Structures are given as C-alpha cells and as structure tokens.
C-alpha cells in the first residue's frame, strides 16, 4: 500500500491540511506540501508528537475541570475549566465573579458534559487563533509547553461562556477517554468557589470586555504567541465523531434550551440579557479556527467535515472579498467578546493575504484572482534614450513611421500641419524629420557622415601628440615677363645645398628650400594659376603665403592684377616682390601707387602688405625676402602633427607612360609613408613610391613637404584632398562616399546666377551685389566700361568687378566667375572653346557685346532689377451707397451709384464715411442688376459686396483702387 499523503492523513485525524502543515513546519519535518507523501518514519513521528501534545494538554484540562465538576473523569477533559481556575487562583478577577452569578450549580454538570477531544482541542486553539491573526507571531515548536499556562488563563473567560452557550445541550456524546491526567494537582476548590461568584449577565458583559483585556498579561493578544497549542487529539479515536450534538437543558444565564441541535440558529436561543458580540454562525455551520481550521470546542463534531462553501473554516464571498458571519466566531472566546474585540479581529485580517494562504488548496485558475490588475495590458513608452530616430541624411516617410512605431498617415497629417504636402514614399531630409518627430516625443539624430568625416575618424597614429612647427607653403605668382622664373632660380641658388640643386631639373611644381637657420620653406609653382583656382573653388587654401612678382620697369600688368585677385579670394597674406630694381628705368614707388588701386597698401604707407625690392639677376634682396616669408609664417603659427596619418592636397596630377597615374601631393598634416593606403579625391590606391623635388626616392614625407606619388588607380583632380587610411576596406568606403557625393552634386547642380535671373534672385533677398568678370580687347575700352559700371552702383545694389583684363575669355575667367557666383562680360572678345565648355559645365552666364552702350543699358536694367520695386496706388473710381440689402448666406450688399471713374471686380475697395477711412479690403461681388459684372462705369448703378465686412450704411462712399509695382531705375547712368 502506498504511503498516505498529508491531506489524506489530515482527513483521517480530523484536521485540515493547512493546520497539519503548520504543525509539520513547527516540528521541522521534511514535508514540503499537503500533496507530499508521508514516509513511515515521518508518519510515526507525527503520530507521536500529536499523541504527546494531547496528553500534555489533557493534564492541564483535568485540573480545572475537576475543580468545577463532581465527576473527575469528565473534568479532566474540559480544557476551558483549568483556564478559569488558573485565572482565579492568580487573582479573583471579575470574570470569576461573573461566572458565579451567571452559572448555577448545574454549570459544572454542563461542563462535565464536555465535548469530545476534537472539540476540546479546537476550543483551546480558538483563542490562540485570534491572537495569531492580530499579531502574526513567528511560532516556535519549543514554546508549546511554555504557553500552556497563558492559554489556560485566556481560556478562562471562554470557559465561562462556553457552558452558557452549549454545555446544557452537550451530554458527553463521546465520553472523555483521558481520565489518567492527575486531577488532584489542580482540583483546588478555588474554581468551584469561583463559579457561584460569577456576576449577573450584564456584569458579565462588561467583565467580558474587561476580562479579555485584564486577565494576566500573558493572556492578552500582545503576550507571547500561542499559536503553538493547536489542540489535543486522541489518536485512538481518530475516526470517532459525535453524530450530533445532544440536547439538554441550558443553565440560566442567557441561553434557553431548544430542540433540533444541528438546526440551531445563530441567535435562536439568544436572550435580551445576552451580551452583544460577534454574530453567531448558522446552525450546523461549524465555527472554525481561522488559523488552524479546527472546529471550536462549543460546536458539534460533525462540522469537522469541510463543505464546499466552508473551505478553510470561512464563509468567503469571492466577488466582494468579505468574510461571512462564521469567520468572527472562531471559538467560544470569540463568541463572548465585545463588539470592540470583534472589530479588532476583523480588521486584523487581510482578505488578499487570507486568499493567498488558502490558494494552496484551491484550483490553479483561482490564482489569477489575486493578479487580475497585474494581468491588465500596460501601455509602455520607450525610455528617452530609446526614442531617438537615426537618420542617414534622408529617410523615406514610411521607414520613419516604422522606426517610430506609428502609422504613416499620422506623419503625413503632421507634415500637412507644417505646410508640407507629403506621401508615404516621399524622401524627407533631416531638417524636416527633426521638425516633426518632437511632436511625437521622439528626437532625430543625423548619423550621416561625409567622406572627410569618415577619413578623419579612421585616422591613426598618435593623434594627441604635441604639434610642431611645419614649413610654410608659398606660391609665387605674377606676369611671365616679370622675372618669376628668375626669382625662383635665385631662391633655389640660395639653398644651403646649392651645389646639388643647381644642376638638377625640377621634376615637380613644388620644392623645398632650406634657409640659413636650417628651417624649410616650400614653394609652389603654379603657371597659369590653374591649380590654385581649382583649389579655391573647392574651398581649400593651397598655400599659406602668396608672393606677387611685379617688374619695376613694367609696372602692374593684367595678369598681375589677376594674381592679386586670386590671392585675395584665397584669403592668404600677400608679399609683393618688386623685381628688376637694378634696371635703369625701375620705379618702385610707381608700382606701390598702382597697387593701392587694388587695395594693396605698403606698410610704410600705413597698410599691411609687405613690399620687398629684389633683383633675380644680381641676386640682391633674396635673403630679405626669405626673412619676410619666415616672419609671416611665424605670425601665422603654422603647426602640424607629424606622428599621425598624413593628409593634404593634390597639387597636380597627370598620366605618364611607364608610370601610370602620377600625383604631386603637398602634405599639410601627418606623415605619408610607402606602403600605406591612400584616397585622393575619388581615387584610391596604395603608395608604391615617393619622390621628392630633387628626384630622390624617399620612404616618408612629413608636413609641408611636396612629394610625387605612384600607385593610384586613376588620375585625381588638381586641388582634391587626399587622406592616408588604415586599410583597403576604409579606402574603398571613403572613395565610394566621395563618388556618391559627387554624383548627387552633379544631379542637382547649384543654380548659377544669370543675367535673366538677377531680378528673381534679388527679390528673394539672396543677392544685393552683382559680381562681374570683365574682359575687353583694348585697355581703353576696359577703363571706360569699368568707369561706367562704377557709376551704376548705389547704396542698395552694387556692381563689383572682381576681375577685369585685356584679352579673350579663358577657362580661368569662367572658374573665377563660378567661384564668386557672378557673370562674365566680354567686349569685342569671344570665349575660346575650352572656356565655352567650362561655362556650360559650370553654368556660368557669359555675355559678349560690341557696343558699349548696349552693355551699359543691359547692366543698368539688371541692376535696377536688384532694387526693390516701388508700390504705387492708382484710384479707379468712386461710388456712393444709396441703399443697403441683406442677402441670406451672403451678407450685406450695398446698392451704389458710380459717381466717378469706374469700379472693377478685381480691385480693392476703401469704405469712406464722412471722408474717414472705415474699412479697406477687397470687392467680394460686383453685380449690375442680377448679372455679375467685371466693371461698372460712371453713371451706372451696381451692387457691391465687401469681403468679410457688412457694416455699410446709406451715404457711405466706396473708393476703388489698385496697387501696382513700379520698377525702380538707377539714378546713375552712362551719360
């Protein structure tokens, strides 16, 4: 036969599984739940402990019972009597006196009729349950015997009420089988004498309240916990249960005997003298101990069997979560307590906690009742750091909605509120996204990175190393006949290593010179200024210092002026080298005066431009020129970090036979080494060799050093930026990003300013200055046109000639005009094929003229378009209001007679009352009779409705007028 389970054994011994599990836990036995099987050893221990506890309990019971009853056997069983006895022995409390008055001599007999063991145990457990519920103490097994005495005291008042309640009706249906406890020990006559001294029922009512709180301190709820003493069980009679409560006469004291024991109502035998207390349980419904599940001692034994409605000893309304009437009456003690005690017991219970304890014995589905609120769907909002939309410059609207967890129409509606008509497939830029996502509690983050940013992030080496001074990069510009090449040769001969450099051909358009103090200066040779202009167009400064070479005998030439304009556009400091001062006709002062016209003022005249007088032929003034270059470089504080990966600019590039793409690089920062991966513009590759300006192979090149590089996959463009990257993957990524950006720029080219678009541009306030590149056939025409254009300038609009020269229109002019967002004007000259192609590619407007006044007139009209037009008001006519009509859903219509001029449908209207302006608006309707009219002439009648205005009175006058924009003309002219 299999081992019995806990709940099966509990049923056998007449206990609830919960009560038995509590005992097992107190005894620290290895049993986990009520469904666990009990091993024979464990079962034997439980039986022994239950038997031992019952004996000890019985010993206490006879003491009090014997004192109160004549039959010692029955007295031994009655546990409540010892409680009263102990309390009376300690101090004769009002409870004892009350009992004396309340219970006559028959009371002991009623007690003798004590209930079976099960009932006695439950009666003893009831008071303990009340205290346990209120205090919820942690019970220890070893406290069981120690707490016996307090329980006796606490049970005393219970005992007094118990006989009143049920002693008469209980005639010992199951004779007590525990006569063995020593009755002589506590048979003192004190309890017997105390019984007759019990006060009247009313006194008892008061004393019940006092007694429950005034019994010995150990009996109060605040005393040591008594949950250890559950009850006493007779294992030899586990299965025996009284079939029904016997009927008998009740002693006087509040209850009257009545028939039908099991059908006894809660208050059928309740008299008016009975003290108020908890509601009595219905007849037949057992009053169980709330903590242990035992049946109270004053109830018949049958209720030990649980019913579906009385699970755990409680009538519990599951919907309202309230306790039924049987819950408070946990035992005789509870039945005899006052209303205040009732409230304390009820309040001490937590319905939810009670259910949690009970859920052990309930079906699984009921567990959800406790977590019903927790099971509700909660609307969660992502935390702030998760509500971030990462945008790669642009994002499709549908993708944005999906990213934010929204519906696309929600974003469309929000965009419409912002005045943007959108659809699901529309690409939104970052600015638009950043405008709408905050409306939904999100934040936009642009994760787009340009190729330069990617290259910068992938830079390697010691990026935090202290920067060191780098050689300055100097560009020499000027007219070809002014000794530029001779000056470069003189500077090269001034090199410390002049013996080596003198006979070596310059391989590239850049070279380094070491001066006397050991520092280096890098010079760039840019014939035609092509590379320099390309660099400026890309927004990069190719050089740190610009040297303008001017011949002292020739003075300023057109190409000299062009070079100065390029240097100014690049924003680099300028040093003017006046060459050929050894010639007889040299006049440096005249050159200084000519350059002041271009805002190049020498230092001795109060300006900021350095002038150096040199002779490339006799090599005079070269040292002073180099010192001035060094001084300007020191002021600029040119520094770089040689310990990081290299970066710089492409000076020039070409395709050579046997070598492939060859690029001349100028390292601006870091170091370039052989074997590294390089990205120059959109071209990538690996550095196969480095050659310096003397044609020598080198392994590395630091900041400010020009080198020739082999290994690129194609020829890059002059002025492109180059970067050294860590690996080929990064090089490919940077190259592809730059190609994508170039394709996007080509697909949507920036709108260039043409002469026809000047007016529209300035209307929007984008342009207030007209940049012009002017070319003419002769110098006289050039001066005349320059003077006329200067006269056209006004404080509001200005014609700025950024470059003017004699000769045809070339590619350099187109690039310069493109950079300045201007136009090119040619007088008696034509652009060459290269310039035409360049102008078409860049979108630069080129205009050529043969008559000077035609050129001036068109420029005057274009600049006049830059002026904001004048607003002129023209009065059309006047009408007098002779009648007023109110038309439903239309408003007020004024019946008018046109007394002057005419009234037009699209004109504005001004309402005059006594020649004072009352309202000014637009005509909403103009009718003659019932027909709409475009205009009504003088002498005719008409109906006029004013838009959004109805306060028209007879006698008012209406003035029709229109506003016209009149283009302004420049006050200056070419007269």
Curated annotation (Swiss-Prot):
Record region (G3): 525-528
Principal location listed in the UniProt entry: cytoplasm
Residue ranges with Low complexity bias: 73-94, 193-202, 209-225, 324-336
Basic residues: compositionally biased ranges: 63-72
Compartments where located: Cytoplasm
UniProt entry tagged with the keyword Protein biosynthesis: yes
Pfam family, one: IF-2
Keyword Magnesium: no
CC annotations in GO: cytosol
Location of region: G1: 478-485
CDD domains, alphabetized: IF2_eIF5B, IF2_mtIF2_II, mtIF2_IVc
Record: residues binding GTP: 478-485, 525-529, 579-582
Disordered: annotated span: 49-110, 193-339
Region named G5: 615-617
Keywords, comma-separated and alphabetical: Cytoplasm, GTP-binding, Initiation factor, Nucleotide-binding, Protein biosynthesis
GO molecular function annotations of the record: GTP binding; GTPase activity; translation initiation factor activity
Biased composition (Basic and acidic residues): 308-318
Positions of the tr-type G domain: 469-639
Ranges for region G2: 503-507
InterPro entries: EF-G-like_DII (IPR053905), EFTu-like_2 (IPR004161), IF2_II (IPR044145), IF2_N (IPR006847), P-loop_NTPase (IPR027417), Small_GTP-bd (IPR005225), T_Tr_GTP-bd_dom (IPR000795), TF_IF2_bacterial-like (IPR000178)
Entries under PANTHER family matching the protein: TR-TYPE G DOMAIN-CONTAINING PROTEIN, TRANSLATION INITIATION FACTOR IF-2-RELATED
Protein function: One of the essential components for the initiation of protein synthesis. Protects formylmethionyl-tRNA from spontaneous hydrolysis and promotes its binding to the 30S ribosomal subunits. Also involved in the hydrolysis of GTP during the formation of the 70S ribosomal complex.
Family: Belongs to the TRAFAC class translation factor GTPase superfamily. Classic translation factor GTPase family. IF-2 subfamily.
HAMAP family: IF_2_B
Protein's recorded name: Translation initiation factor IF-2
Organism: Bdellovibrio bacteriovorus (strain ATCC 15356 / DSM 50701 / NCIMB 9529 / HD100)
UniProt lineage: Bacteria, Pseudomonadati, Bdellovibrionota, Bdellovibrionia, Bdellovibrionales
